[in-house]
Amino acid sequence: MVTIRLARHGAKKRPFYQIVVADSRNVATGRFIEKVGFFNPTAQGQEEGLRIDLDRVNHWVGQGASLSDRVAKLVKDAQKAA
């Protein structure tokens, strides 16, 4: 099953997440099909905290991909801001 989820990157105590489309059987930070955005929970000042390509997310959801709980909330927030 294909899922859209967060892949953690960044340094210790400084998380940075890539929003990726991946097979659910793969490791969370491993192989992925496509990167559709990023999420920086520690963004300050003028730093961009969230960027999601909503067209690609909608494409993958139309193809049957499922969203993780956190990504679903982030997509909802991005749609509200757009």
Swiss-Prot record:
Signal peptide: none
Keyword entries, A-Z: Ribonucleoprotein, Ribosomal protein
Pfam families, A to Z: Ribosomal_S16
InterPro entries: Ribosomal_bS16 (IPR000307), Ribosomal_bS16_CS (IPR020592), Ribosomal_bS16_dom_sf (IPR023803)
Keyword Ribosomal protein: yes
Record-level Gene Ontology MF annotations: structural constituent of ribosome
BP term (GO), one: translation
Keyword set includes Ribonucleoprotein: yes
GO cellular component: cytoplasm; small ribosomal subunit
UniProt-listed PANTHER family: 30S RIBOSOMAL PROTEIN S16 (PTHR12919), SMALL RIBOSOMAL SUBUNIT PROTEIN BS16M (PTHR12919:SF20)
Family named by the database record: Belongs to the bacterial ribosomal protein bS16 family.
HAMAP family attached to this UniProt entry: Ribosomal_bS16
Protein name: Small ribosomal subunit protein bS16
UniProt organism field: Vibrio vulnificus (strain YJ016)
Designated gene of the protein: rpsP
